[in-house]
UniProtKB/Swiss-Prot annotation:
Name of encoding gene: P25
Domain of life from the UniProt record: Viruses
Upper classification of the organism: Viruses, Viruses incertae sedis, Naldaviricetes, Lefavirales, Baculoviridae
Keywords from the named record: Host nucleus, Membrane, Virion
InterPro entries for this protein: Baculo_ODV-E25
Location within or outside the cell: Virion membrane; Host nucleus
Official protein name in the record: Virus envelope protein E25
Family statement: Belongs to the baculoviridae p25 family.
Function: Plays a role in the production of infectious budded virion (BV) and occlusion-derived virion (ODV) formation.
């Protein structure tokens, strides 16, 4: 009896496989293993193939600007907890560099929701660097000395090694004309924000998106490239 049932099941499976209704590779194709990356191949406007690497949570960029200036910037491609920031900042982020992204208030508020602190800036000390929090964002200057130029409820801005680094509150009003002019006239400007209105204004003013998450924008630079 059970032998007949098993035979019928096998025949049905064979039929489904033969007609391509059953794909034994579907599980591995839709769920990459831990050793696989989520890289993608895209066709650009010039019909050339570009490989886009998405297997890391921190992008490492080298930006050329000014008179032979090179700035090293690390951008978190997803929100990180304070513990993650300390770990990435200690293990992956090199010296003489800037590290920024979105922070979670790990252990203070919910670890599953981004920070909503009303404080303009808060500084947390790590072993060999400080973590500055601005609204739901963070910035780390590792081995470089920044000069703070703007700090208000909507924007935090520094100058470091002839490059402007700016964080824009994701919940603030759209950028004013004065703010846009100030950002445009700067030498090299890196803006990090999740503010959709601000992102649109930056794109309209010819800022370039430089990370996969589309939260980092660059202007007045010579070139940039992602490092391994």
């Amino acid at each position: 009896m059970w032998g007949i049932v098993l035979l019928i099941v096998l025949l049905i499976l064979f039929y489904l496989y033969w007609t391509n209704a059953l794909n034994f590779n579907s599980l591995t194709e839709s769920s990459p293993s831990l050793g696989q990356s989520s890289d993608s191949v895209e066709l650009d406007e010039n019909k050339q193939l570009n490989v886009k690497l998405n297997n890391g949570r921190v992008a490492n960029l080298r930006i050329a600007h000014g008179d032979n200036k090179l700035s090293q910037v690390y951008i978190a491609e997803k929100p990180l907890s304070i513990d993650d920031i300390v770990k990435e900042g200690s293990n992956k982020v090199g010296t003489n560099s800037v590290f920024l992204g979105t922070v979670y208030d790990y252990g203070i508020k919910s670890p599953n929701a981004a920070s909503t602190s009303s404080n303009v800036t808060m500084t947390r000390g790590a072993a060999n660097f400080d973590i500055k929090e601005f609204k739901s964002m963070f910035i780390v200057f590792k081995g470089v000395t920044p000069t703070k130029t703007v700090e208000d409820n909507g924007m935090l801005r520094f100058e470091v090694d002839n490059m402007i680094v700016c964080l824009i509150d994701p919940n603030t009003a759209p950028l004013s004309e004065r703010e846009v002019r100030e950002l445009r006239k700067s030498n090299c400007t890196l803006v990090y924000t999740r503010n959709a209105a601000a992102q649109q204004v930056l794109l309209e003013n010819n800022f370039t998106v430089i990370n996969a998450e589309q939260t980092a924008y660059l202007k007045n630079y010579k070139s940039y490239r992602e490092m391994n």
